[in-house]
């Protein structure tokens, strides 16, 4: 079984790039199938309204639950005070299995980590090159699984990647 744990799907409400405009799955599924990928974790495209984006993603996941697993997207700043409710809805109503957070939106918060702990789900946190908080996450939330994509830097910042590798060695 090969799992792709980082695939955006659906429509965002921005127009700056594919990450916030539209992430259709047809071409992706063709390539994934050819590569032997049997399951995909889907994440909503960037949006100014992640509650809506999560609902839309739930419909996509429900269309092929044997193939797709959903992670809800939350915004640490805009969703402050309602993260627990958003995550609870995503896990219990939509059947999602994790949380997605992006540093581009705002730094991860205790509210998000506490929701992950409460529901016992992983957090996929794109740190966007800011790897220092990963050590704090490892020590403050040792019982929460954190997935740090792109080796800590989408832009291939080797300094950030080496720093992340060092932290991973110290906090396996």
Regions found by a protein language model. Name each.
Residues 32, 61-65, 91, 138-139, ...:
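N-terminal cationic-hydrophobic initiation segments that often serve targeting/anchoring roles
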Residues 1, 36-40, 64-70, 93-97, ...:
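Short, well-ordered coil/turn segments that N-cap beta-strands
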Residues 105-172:
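Catalytic pocket-lining loop regions of alpha/beta-barrel enzymes
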Residues 23-29, 51-60, 84-85, 131-136, ...:
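Alpha-helical scaffolding within the catalytic cores
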Residues 2-5, 41-44, 71-72, 100, ...:
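Active-site neighborhood of phospho(di)ester-bond hydrolases with catalytic His/Asp-centered motifs
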Residues 1-56:
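An N-terminally biased module of ancient metal coordination in phosphate/nucleic-acid-related enzymes
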Residues 47-125:
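Active-site gating/metal-coordination segments in enzymes
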Residues 8, 102, 152:
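Catalytic metal-binding/acid-base residues of hydrolase active sites
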């Amino acid at each position: 079984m090969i799992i792709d744990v980082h695939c955006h799907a659906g429509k965002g409400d921005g127009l700056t790039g594919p990450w916030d405009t539209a992430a259709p799955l047809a071409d992706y599924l063709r390539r994934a199938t050819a590569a032997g990928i049997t399951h995909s974790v889907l994440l909503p495209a960037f949006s100014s309204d992640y509650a809506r984006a999560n609902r839309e993603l739930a419909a996509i996941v429900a269309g092929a639950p044997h193939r797709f697993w959903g992670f809800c997207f939350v915004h640490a700043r805009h969703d402050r005070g309602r993260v627990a409710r958003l995550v609870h809805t995503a896990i219990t109503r939509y059947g999602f299995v994790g949380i997605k957070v992006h540093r581009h939106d705002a730094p991860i918060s205790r509210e998000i980590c506490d929701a992950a702990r409460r529901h016992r789900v992983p957090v996929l946190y794109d740190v966007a090159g800011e790897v220092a908080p990963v050590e704090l996450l490892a020590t403050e939330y040792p019982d929460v699984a954190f997935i740090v994509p792109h080796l800590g830097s989408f832009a291939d910042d080797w300094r950030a990647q080496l720093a992340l590798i060092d932290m991973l060695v110290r906090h396996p």
